[in-house]
Amino acid sequence: MEITLKGRIPSKKNQKQIIYRNGKPLIISSKKHKEWHTEQMWMVKGKGKVEEVKNIDITLYAPDKRKGDLTNKAESIMDLLVDAGIIEDDNWMIVPNVFLRFGGVDKENPRAVITINKK
């Protein structure tokens, strides 16, 4: 199964905000990350579920030459796949191998290409 996510992939770890509930601080995902997550959920819903995953191959294409942390972006993608119901969980027993690579800069079409290979 191949899925393409359009646009810049936000880093989940660097997109946090602190709110206060009952006088206690609570760290939550930022509005920007939530908007991206919700938008992409609509794009990938209905793609089907992969029961037995051999590996997941993620290739990221950036819109510019700014430095970015690939593993943080991969975490956003893996959480999206779980929340959309495409994979059951992203732990190593369900997904034994994740291959992550930088595909280069594509100013016109930044994206993430995700290939999920079944056992």
Describe the predicted segments one by one:
Residues M1-K119:
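Acidic, proline/glycine-enriched N-terminal capping motif
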